[in-house]
Amino acid sequence: MTNIRKTHPLMKIVNNAFIDLPAPSNISSWWNFGSLLGICLILQILTGLFLAMHYTSDTMTAFSSVTHICRDVNYGWIIRYMHANGASMFFICLFMHVGRGLYYGSYTFLETWNIGVILLFTVMATAFVGYVLPWGQMSFWGATVITNLLSAIPYIGTNLVEWIWGGFSVDKATLTRFFAFHFILPFIIAALAMVHLLFLHETGSNNPTGIPSDADKIPFHPYYTIKDILGILLLILFLMLLVLFAPDLLGDPDNYTPANPLNTPPHIKPEWYFLFAYAILRSIPNKLGGVLALVSSILILILMPLLHTSKQRSMMFRPFSQCLFWILVADLLTLTWIGGQPVEYPFIIIGQLASVLYFLIILVLMPITSTIENNLLKW
């Protein structure tokens, strides 16, 4: 008799995705981040659900309701900090996952890659609207500044901003709709993640060499299930270390002050995971130019398959491209640091140089370097 997991309509899907899936025998720990992102999403949906049971999306009571969750609700404080720091872990895993894709040439799976980029935008949108909900100073002013950027769009900009706000400023209507968006988007992310996996399983996973691994496959279970469990345990360890020992390490102290439209904080800045894009935005003195650069900094990922000029898929055997990749990583860390600094000398010029270097590496230096490497190998 055939095993039920191979015949039952529902279990068959799970079996083909997580049990009998043929996987390359040599994928490293960089391939763990997909499963970690799945765990992060489940964790965020669960903690978010319990927070939503006690949260009120009204300007008068939002800040108080978050305080109430932390002080009066049983284990409310741990749920709240797991949700806030879970977002940080989510983005750490996301950046690692995207970095892995860039390094090993996984972007040649076009559908999987493009859905991944859409997922990245969706997660960023979710995190942004979520940051507004506690209705602290940085929530309010972050929402005001970032939504205001849409006014740079010619002709329809101002109308678009007022339409999103639901009035002439960030107010009750804005908070209510942002809560609605924040509730629905994670489920859209979950659906997109399933499509992402669907397309990945059409081609099978890439591997560190970038060479097709059809000749050497192993079953996903038990080899990679046990490997994923190790990754999940480490993820939970780091998350709980953050939650229990330094819950406010990655937050902004200004967000412990209730939102006040009459008092602007001295330094408006987003959460750490948006700082690199914020630095690129600020490095251009023109409003529309800054917005275009901001969007391009993420949208540029869609161009990666077009910019791939190497005859090899992975960077594993391409030392010059490896150097450029790690310079790009250092550049992104520099941009993250600059995004959190005040707009003054020398930070302005450092930010501008780092922004130029970011686009220069991706659009110009990487394709040229790949071509040089091809020639050196007489290809």
From Swiss-Prot:
The keyword Transmembrane helix applies. One of its GO terms (molecular function) is ubiquinol-cytochrome-c reductase activity. The chain crosses the membrane at residues 33-53, 77-98, 113-133, 178-198, 226-246, 288-308, 320-340, 347-367. PROSITE patterns: CYTB_CTER, CYTB_NTER. Keywords: Electron transport, Extinct organism protein, Heme, Iron, Membrane, Metal-binding, Mitochondrion, Mitochondrion inner membrane, Respiratory chain, Transmembrane, Transmembrane helix, Transport, Ubiquinone. It is found in: Mitochondrion inner membrane. Heme b b562 binds at H83, H182. GO terms for biological process: mitochondrial electron transport, ubiquinol to cytochrome c. Its main location: mitochondrion. Gene3D superfamilies: Cytochrome Bc1 Complex, Chain C. This is Cytochrome b. It comes from Megaloceros giganteus.
